[in-house]
């Protein structure tokens, strides 16, 4: 029987600030969707909701997931330590 890994979730400062921004703005649907995506990330960070695909260029190694048409969750996956590092959860790729 193959044991499925569970990824540890790490929250960077910018991600936590973005969550507060969504709370202050009353974006409950964004917060609900983020919670669901984070649960998915624990099991399979490279597939699932929000059209994940690796970024290229200066963001190589990072992955986006669509939260809304305007907002993206950006994260990095560290297979060696089975960790997903949540970087940000606001507007596209830091263009605020």
What does each model-identified segment do?
Residues 1-8, 16-32, 36, 56, ...:
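Enriched for short, Lys/Arg-rich terminal
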């Amino acid at each position: 029987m193959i044991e499925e890994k569970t990824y540890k979730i790490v929250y960077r400062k910018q991600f936590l600030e973005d969550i507060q921004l969504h709370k202050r703005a009353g974006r409950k649907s964004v917060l609900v969707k983020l919670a669901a995506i984070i649960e998915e990330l624990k099991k399979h960070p490279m597939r699932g909701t929000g059209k994940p695909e690796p970024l290229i260029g200066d963001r190589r190694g990072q992955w986006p997931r669509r939260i809304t048409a305007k907002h993206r969750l950006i994260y990095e996956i560290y297979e060696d330590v089975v960790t997903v590092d949540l970087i940000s959860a606001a507007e596209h790729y830091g263009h605020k």
